[in-house]
Design a protein with these regions (language model features):
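Juxtamembrane intracellular "pre-TM" segments in multi-pass secondary transporters
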Residues: 2-21, 199-254, 439
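Hydrophobic alpha-helix/TM-entry signal in multi-pass membrane transporters
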Residues: 19-27, 86, 114, 248-253, ...
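A single, central transmembrane helix in multi-pass transporters
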Residues: 24, 28, 36-40, 172-180, ...
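Hydrophobic core of transmembrane alpha-helices in multi-pass small-molecule transporters
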Residues: 28, 109-127, 338-352
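Small-residue hotspots at the loop-to-helix junctions and early N-terminal turns
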Residues: 40, 49-57, 281-288, 375
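Intracellular juxtamembrane helix-capping segments at the cytosolic ends
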Residues: 41, 127-140, 352-365
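C-terminal transmembrane bundle of multi-pass solute transporters/carriers
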Residues: 62, 67-95, 99, 244, ...
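Hydrophobic alpha-helical transmembrane segments
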Residues: 111-122, 147-206, 285, 289-290, ...
Length: 439
């Protein structure tokens, strides 16, 4: 028996779980490619004789596509196996970057053609997250959901930290080489997507360790396309119905939406402030990197914390720490290095907060509906991001940095208050005490 077989997985579940590991690797490669896109798109548009304003417009189209596609991506994943959805995403992104490379090498200056290709691969990339969550729910025991979420947090933070510098370095050599590198990342991601057999094996191993009442198990076909008997709109409505019917899920949607409004607006406000104060883009990058470093550090603690603390305690401590850091920024933002330290400290509890939410959703939602539920929960987050982006610019121009930072910090405090007053969130148990509906 090899170390990677399901029979030995309980000794070190995540490290031995090839279905999870290959999924995490595929997502890491896709997210690194995505993090490089900001540099790639900007350089590509300017190389086509476009202005910075035109580059911003193309980036806006991609962001808008990501938001709208994200609303229904979970529903789409629920109507196909997560493996097929991940293959579709990787393939489309690979072909998309090949198309952009061909466009660049042809000498074309068609911004419209470039935008259409980028919109297509951006839409496809939104299938990644719900596919990963569905595979995790199917193959990872409930006691390891916190660690699985922590790996995802660390992976995303690492991609954000290193993606832009790597892209800038490669672009300095050749823009064509950068485009080829991004396509290659997505192609390798396609190659490491877990096999159907691997997912089925770990699903069976999980269910055999935690047998469902009556000895039933969830098969691959059970979760492959649960919505095929109804329309995609009906599946979308079902995701919302499940969230609205569960007071805890509804509270999670409210808390995450409000918190994300604050965490989107405050960094932008600080960027505007430091730019207006004459700081170079390098120092602004250092500030954003400090937060990412904090998230990376915090991700190493999630497994330890989720084993010992209730999810409610994790969530309250995380939101409280972030709120305290944002309130501190109101007063210390004129001092750059003090702000960077506070940003790094505020990033440490974020993985625990996200892990507690994702672990609860994955443990308490049946596998067949996980994609649509995650999409429904993501709507408030995605809906408030553009509002926060707009508010940061408008309020900074009208009020200045201090008042704008205080405005956003108040929303973070409000999310903490909701965590404290909602019984469903205040009483969440430890991960080990959750009843896993997928076992």
């Amino acid at each position: 028996m090899t170390p990677n077989t399901p029979a030995s997985a309980p000794k070190n579940p995540l490290r031995a779980n090839t279905a999870f590991q290959r999924t995490a690797a595929a997502l890491a490669l896709n997210q690194l490619s995505d993090a490089m896109s900001l540099i790639t798109i900007t350089f590509m548009v300017i190389a086509m004789n476009g202005s910075p304003e035109l580059a911003s417009l193309v980036l806006f189209c991609c962001s808008f596509t990501a938001i709208t596609a994200g609303i229904i991506s979970g529903t789409i994943v629920d109507r196909m196996t997560p493996r097929r959805a991940l293959i579709l995403s990787c393939t489309t992104q690979t072909l998309g970057w090949v198309g952009v490379l061909a466009l660049s090498m042809s000498g074309s200056h068609s911004i419209v053609a470039l935008t259409l290709i980028l919109v297509l691969l951006t839409a496809a990339s939104q299938l990644d997250y719900p596919s990963e969550q569905k595979i995790i729910a199917a193959t990872v025991p409930v006691t390891d959901l916190g660690r699985a979420s922590a790996i995802g947090q660390a992976r995303e933070s690492a991609a954000s930290l290193f993606g832009a510098p790597i892209a800038g370095f490669i672009a300095g050599i050749s823009l064509h080489l950068l485009l080829a590198a991004q396509g290659l990342l997505n192609l390798v991601a396609l190659a490491v997507v877990p096999s159907r057999r691997s997912i089925d094996q770990y699903r069976k191993a999980k269910n055999s360790d935690n047998p469902a009442p009556g000895g039933s198990t969830v098969s691959a076909t059970d979760s492959a396309a649960p919505g095929t008997t109804s329309g995609i709109l009906a599946d979308f409505k079902d995701g919302w119905r499940r969230v609205l019917a569960d007071k805890t899920l509804l509270a999670i949607a409210a808390v995450t939406g409000i918190a994300n409004f604050a965490t989107t607006g405050i960094p932008l406000t600080l960027i505007y402030y430091y730019q207006s104060a004459g700081f170079s883009a390098l120092w602004v990058g250092v500030l954003m990197g400090a937060f990412g470093a904090g998230v990376l550090t915090g991700s190493t603690l999630v497994g330890f914390l989720t084993d010992r603390l209730a999810l409610s305690t994790l969530g309250i401590c995380a939101v409280g720490t972030i709120a305290a850091g944002q309130l501190a920024a109101v007063f210390i933002h004129p001092t750059f290095w003090a702000t960077a330290v506070v940003f790094a400290l505020a990033g440490v509890p974020l993985p625990a907060f996200n892990a507690s939410i994702m672990a609860y959703v994955n443990a308490t939602t049946d596998e067949a509906a996980i994609g649509r539920v995650h999409s429904a929960l993501g709507v408030p987050v995605m809906a408030l991001m553009p509002a926060a982006t707009l508010a940061a610019g408008v309020l900074f121009g009208a009020w200045g940095a201090g008042a704008t930072l205080l405005f956003f910090a108040v929303f973070m405090v409000l999310s903490l208050v909701l965590m404290l007053v909602q019984p469903g969130l205040r009483t969440l148990p430890k991960l080990s005490e959750l009843e896993d509906v997928n076992s």
